[in-house]
């Protein structure tokens, strides 16, 4: 899940259904033969994801994503990436610039994937987000790990001190 949803996450002038299969367009499920798209299956898949991930779009799966809110664009990216069923999901700034409702939705989706046994790596500058959805926090400063924290036993203030480079208690060992 890229940090810049417009530059790396979506093709803004494509409709929602084509954005939802960007990484999967070549799969047999979405094709008829070697080059022809199976529009019916693509549309059904899009409608399922729109419902499952609460993606709000004015014209359903035919909505041009440029016209959608940032929160709904982000939910579409999350839907697409989760539906690829990765063992490891890397989410960079997954809720940057989103409203409270969209943030809650995305956090719930990430937590659901974690609960299914998936590894979720979240890179975020949002301290509350890090504390809310993390099982383990590794803090970096100037490219180095400076702390390993348990979110249940740390505060925003302590986490902020590590992020600012004021604290460094992590002794990196080979193999960690």
Role assignments for model-derived ranges:
Residues 124-125:
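H-loop/switch region of ABC-family ATPase nucleotide-binding domains
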Residues 1-68, 147-150, 155, 161-167:
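Conserved P-loop NTPase catalytic core
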Residues 104-116:
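Helical segment within the ABC ATPase nucleotide-binding domain
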Residues 92, 99:
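ABC-family nucleotide-binding domains
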Residues 85:
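Conserved catalytic motifs of ABC-family nucleotide-binding domains
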Residues 130-132:
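A short, surface-exposed alpha-helical micro-motif characterized by mixed small hydrophobic
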């Amino acid at each position: 899940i890229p940090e810049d949803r417009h530059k790396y996450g979506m093709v803004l002038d494509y409709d929602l259904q084509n954005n939802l299969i960007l990484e999967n367009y070549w799969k047999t499920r979405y094709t008829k033969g070697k080059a022809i798209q199976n529009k019916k299956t693509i549309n059904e898949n899009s409608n399922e994801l729109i419902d499952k991930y609460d993606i709000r779009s004015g014209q359903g799966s035919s909505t041009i994503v440029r016209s959608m809110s940032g929160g709904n664009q982000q939910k579409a990216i999350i839907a697409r990436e989760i539906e690829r069923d990765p063992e490891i999901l890397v989410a960079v700034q997954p809720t940057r610039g989103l409203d409270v409702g969209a943030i809650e939705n995305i956090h719930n989706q990430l937590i659901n994937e974690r609960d299914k046994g998936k590894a979720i790596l979240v890179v975020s500058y949002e301290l509350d987000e890090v504390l809310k959805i993390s099982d383990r926090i590794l803090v970096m400063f100037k490219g180095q790990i400076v702390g390993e924290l348990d979110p249940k036993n740390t505060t925003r203030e302590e986490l902020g001190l590590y992020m600012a480079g004021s604290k460094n208690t992590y002794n990196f060992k080979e193999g960690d």
